[in-house]
Every structure is written in C-alpha cells, then in structure tokens.
Amino acid sequence: MKKISRRSFLLAAGMSAALVLTACSSTSSSTASSTASSAASAASDAASASTQAIQSLEDLAGKTVGVQLGTTGDLLMSEEVGEGEDKLGIAGVEQYNKAADAVQALLTNKIDAVCIDDQVAKNFVAANPDELTTLDTAFAEESYAIAVSKDNPDLTEALNGAIAELKEDGTLDAILDKYIAKVEGATGYVSPEGTEYPNGTLVMATNATFDPYEYIENGEIVGIDAEFAKALCDKLGYDLHIEDMEFDSIIAAVNSGKADFGMAGMTVTPERQEQIDFTDTYCTAAQSIIVLK
C-alpha cells in the first residue's frame, strides 16, 4: 500500500463534483406515490454514487467518516474536520464503541467511510469482499506499544527487556507470520510445557474487537496482542489474565491499578504519553480508509 504525507495528498487531484437531485410533485395521489417512489430511488442512487466517488483521500471532503472511539483513527479524523490548508475538509466524524459498528454503519449507508488500522481493515474487507474496499493510499503510519502506569517503571523496563528478546529470538515474527502473513503451518506462540509462574499474575486490559490484534474466538481472547502478551509474561515468570473492556477505558484501568498493562493495538501519541508510559514499540501499522465499492 502506497503511503504519502498529508501535505502531499492535499496537493493532489481536486475534490469530486457534488451530485444535485431535483424531484417534481403532483396533486394526484397516484402521481404523488410514483414521485415519492422515484425520489426515494434517486436518493438511494445518489447516496450510492456519492460513496462510489470516494477513490482517494481528497474525495473525503464533505463526507462523514466513522471511527472507533478513542483510537488513532478517531484522533486523526477529528483533526480533518472543516476547512484549512492542511485539512481533508471532512464534514464530520461519527464515533462508535466497536470497529464492527462503524463498518456496519458504512454498509447501511449511514456514513461514507471508515478510518481504521490497516490489518483490521483488511479483515473487514475480506469478510465483505463484494461490498467493501480500501483506498490505495494509507492515511498515516503508526507504531504500537504497551501502556504501563507511570507509577510502575520497573514493569516498563522488564517488558522492554522481554520485547527485545522475543524480537531477537524470532517469537514475535512467528506470531506475525500466523496472524498477518498467514504463513501456512505457522503456529505462532504456545507456552512451553512445564512453564511456571513464580511471580504471580499480570492483568492485561484490552478491547477484543480488533482482529487480528485481539478478538474473541471460541469464547477466548486471541490475536497478535494476546499471544505476544502471553509470550512476554512467560518470559518474565508471570501468568496472564486478560480483561476485555471498551478501548477508551484501557488507560484509566491501568492507571487505577485494575490492570497492570494495556495492549490493544495502541498507538503511541503525545496526548497518551501525558497520561501513561509506553514500552518500546513492537509492531508498525498504518491507518486505512474503508469505503463501499
């Protein structure tokens, strides 16, 4: 997927032309009924045509974009509302508690596009291949890290050491091969037989609606983050317990002590760094725009 800077794509092709609908009315009931039917059909066609016109980031001007509340997509799209030299000029942002809710709103023509992490976007498109696609240009690149309370620097340091080791020994690559590259026969990470947990249990806060990073399968939370967290905890001598919650509640849960760390495809941003510490990054992704075909 090609990636360009915000300024570069804002200097690219101009905005799409707007579609204008007009309808006539009649005093006869039969004509009124026919007119209403035609108007409804025309409105539906217009909505479809409007969405189909989104072929580039510039085409988002005047459109409504759906995001998951509190995510990087939410932060980025909120900055693009309105007019300005460095803005996309979108009409508004609709926030949803779950990414799937945003995609459903797109499928039912309630919004014009969805901004979400690229790997997550790929899974939604794969599940709806006849209806959805993504723009060829990624919106922004980002790096994921683990959120830890500023009051727990020892845990941050320990996790950083374990992250470095699991990158070096190929464990992280094995997990990514399973969930992203989808290498045939890739098994990801499985705790070695006889693994012990002398240091107790660490609680991880997540939002299990973010396939392939964390999602529920057969009643269990699985995915890149869940599996990598298990590998990290095994390395440090801790058992792992995962708590599922709204994404926007994760940082508060960690800071309050309800969870030891947060891991949910979480991007390191200056705003979040004011509230919480982050480990070294372990994965890089980009924001993608999902639209109707």
Model-inferred region functions:
Residues 92-95, 197-266:
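Extracytoplasmic small-molecule ligand-binding "clamshell" domains
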